[in-house]
């Protein structure tokens, strides 16, 4: 299982490796071992789910995967790997990967139905189905959007998107500075140092509303920023 899921070695190649060493192990046998191993690990997975939901902050995202020969789906169709991680200051750190055949919001809603903390995500509306969580926008996604909107070779003096990008960089730099401090100290530092940067950022975002020169990417990012505020 480590070779398959950590090292990326598929079972047919593992079969060949064992065969070179004079050991006959069919892919069917290896697959059955993986299935049985997954059953043994289920209690641990349930405990990870409980620890994840007990926290105060969860970051979530989903990405496209393709599964060959999946029942009821064409090989070229898209499935999803949903990824959930504890906030960086949680006592128990959990990294939870959940495969699902689609991007429906019912999947995070089911896993996080008892979660009452802050859920940090991109702007995908499917996360709105998580019933008790407080949605929070992800600054890493926002930063990437500003970066993608920057013309090649742009600087903060020539591109509106670059200005947004630099605001995000300032916020990330401040967060790195606060790392290791007591939660109360971090709160005070954020109020003293981060809040003025955020106020300036939101004022700048509002100014884009009145700027007809902004390109479509910049306008799109402005709307995303305002909706995630």
What residue spans do the PLM features occupy?
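Catalytic center-proximal scaffold of phosphoryl-transfer enzymes
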Residues: 1-229
């Amino acid at each position: 299982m480590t070779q398959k899921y950590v090292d990326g070695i598929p079972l047919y190649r593992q079969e060949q490796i064992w065969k070179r060493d004079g050991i006959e192990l069919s892919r069917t046998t290896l697959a059955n071992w993986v299935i049985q191993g997954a059953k043994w690990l289920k209690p641990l997975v349930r405990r990870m789910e409980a620890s994840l939901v007990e926290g105060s902050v969860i970051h979530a995202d989903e990405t496209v995967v393709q599964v060959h020969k999946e029942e009821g789906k064409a090989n070229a169709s898209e499935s999803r790997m949903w990824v959930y991680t504890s906030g960086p200051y949680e006592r128990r750190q959990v990294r939870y990967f959940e495969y699902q055949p689609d991007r429906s919001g019912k999947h995070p809603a089911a896993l996080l139905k008892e979660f009452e903390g802050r859920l940090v995500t991109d702007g995908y509306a499917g996360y709105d189905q998580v019933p008790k969580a407080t949605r929070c926008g992800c600054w890493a996604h926002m930063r990437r959007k500003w970066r993608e909107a920057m013309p090649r070779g742009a600087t903060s003096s020539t591109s509106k998107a670059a200005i947004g990008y630099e605001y995000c960089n300032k916020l990330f730099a401040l967060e790195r500075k606060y790392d290791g401090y007591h939660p109360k100290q971090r709160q005070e530092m954020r109020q003293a140092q981060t809040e003025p940067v955020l106020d300036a950022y939101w004022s700048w975002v509002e100014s884009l509303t009145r700027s007809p020169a902004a390109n479509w990417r910049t306008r799109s990012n402005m709307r995303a920023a305002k909706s995630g505020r």
